[in-house]
Amino acid sequence: PGFDARAIALSAGTCEALVRHGLWPRFAPHCSPITQIHVSDRGHFGQASLSAAEYGLPALGQVIELSAAGITLQQGMAACPNIHMLCPAQLSTIEPLEEGVTLTLAGGERYQTRLLVAADGGHSFVRQHFKLPVSRHDYEQSAIIATVKTAEDPAGRAFERFTDGGPLALLPMQDGLSSLVWSVPR
């Protein structure tokens, strides 16, 4: 899989799930906590500020680069004896069984499994095979994504500003950096 330097925010609930499954120690060194969120709306007087301390939480969420998250997940899966990861691989057939499926890969290898997850992209062979519905909505926006260094260290503060053209967000990252996501009309 290809993982790039874009950052994602993990909710507090997602982090709790990683703790429950024993994966958090692998993720923690790569994460930056979101301890405060400031939300504003251009052209309106209202604004909101959320603080993890107000909710008795160590953080409202965590920010991690996709590359670090991907590598961490791969290492975690490699450490699980009951997970057999095939990557890259291309499915050619799926045969339903009473309890699971038999998968045939393009190279002819066959695998039987009780669980098959349709997480193979926007043109999912698995989704198409099982005729799973797709819901799409074009927001007619593009996102400008960058990692920026600001004059002041973000220190756990995230910012989101809603504008007529789309939202603008800054997420705190490690080493005093921030992830910028700026949605602009297409």
Named regions from a protein language model:
Residues 8-10, 27, 48-50, 126, ...:
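Short clusters of hydrophobic/aromatic residues that line enzyme substrate/ligand-binding pockets
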Residues 18, 73, 170:
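Residue-level signal for inorganic ion chemistry
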